[in-house]
Amino acid sequence: MGYTSKLALKICLVGLCLFSTLSAEHLEQKGNYIYKGEEAYNNKEYERAASFYKSAIKNGESLAYVLLGIMYENGRGVPKDYKKAVEYFQKAVDNDIPRGYNNLGVMYKEGKGVPKDEKKAVEYFRIATEKGYTNAYINLGIMYMEGRGVPSNYAKATECFRKAMHKGNVEAYILLGDIYYSGNDQLGIEPDKDKAVVYYKMAADISSSRAYEGLSESYQYGLGVEKDKKKAEEYMQKACDFDIDKNCKKKNTSSR
């Protein structure tokens, strides 16, 4: 399936999608500006969203530092500016916002707006995990898996993924599924397609395009489950519904 290396590149940015951990209840509790910013962002009214986050900052809502930093990192509603993104993530850290530590770690990992420093990235990811930010376990685990900023240690990587999984993180289920799908000599894990499918199904229950994609391929080729072309197409359609540009192309390829 070859997920792991490709997935790692994507998951290293965990925490930079805008509203991955914000509930409507939380937003309403904190005030209008962040909630209105979310609505504007979801409607692709990015300039309005950025304006609301700036107002939220003036209103003392420190989480808005992270959200505005992400806008600058992605160039949505404001000019793309990695240095400004770093400044806002740093302000979030100064206000002890767990997600700020994680996102600042990503910037150091990628060398965006700051000199690349993987050891510093690991430090920020670790602090974010200690403060309860679940996505940081994924980032920290990948650093251990790839030996970046720390010695390569698959056992510690897997431990991070399991901690994230127990907190309901979808990416953790997928990464653990990948490990069982391909096997891992360092962990003494033989390829186990059956167990991989179990993890992919759990991720799909939480809803994830990559999990549905994994299930589609498993059913298409009879890997860990009985071969079933119809189910393969159904799961790929669900993956397509999540990520139309990527997964619809894969759907067309796998149907051949």
Predicted regions and their residues:
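Short helix-capping/linker turns of helical repeat alpha-solenoids
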Residues: 28, 40-41, 58-62, 74-76, ...
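TPR/TPR-like (Sel1-like) alpha-helical repeat modules
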Residues: 226-244
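Alpha-helical segment of the N-proximal tetratricopeptide repeat
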Residues: 29-55, 59
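Hydrophobic face of amphipathic alpha-helices that form TPR/SEL1-like repeat modules
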Residues: 33-42, 66-74, 103-110, 139-146, ...
